[in-house]
Amino acid sequence: MSGLGIMVLTLLLLVFMETSHQDAGEKQAMQRDAINVRRRRSITRRVSEACEESCEEEEKHCCHENNGVYTCLRYCWG
């Protein structure tokens, strides 16, 4: 094989190795971003201002409101 052929094959091998390395880095970044999105997701509760004020006096959060009865807790689950 001529010297030019060996140089071309070497160049192709180097390009292939570099693009494979970049693809792996992009895949890791996408996985990391997906994990961060899952962690940021939260539940937004919609309750009346009266419920918020009532629970605020007890230094708690209004988690649920049903027919004027307020459920005030330190942490709202689910």
From Swiss-Prot:
Keywords: Amidation, Cleavage on pair of basic residues, Disulfide bond, Knottin, Neurotoxin, Secreted, Signal, Toxin. Residues 1-19 form the signal peptide. Its main location: secreted. Residues 20-44 form a propeptide. Expressed by the venom duct. One of its GO terms (molecular function) is toxin activity. It is found in: Secreted. InterPro entries: Conotoxin. Disulfide bonds join C51-C63, C55-C72, C62-C76. The modification Tryptophan amide is found at W77. It holds the Pfam family Conotoxin. One of its GO terms (cellular component) is extracellular region. Belongs to the conotoxin O3 superfamily. The presence of a 'disulfide through disulfide knot' structurally defines this protein as a knottin. This is Conotoxin ArMSGL-011.
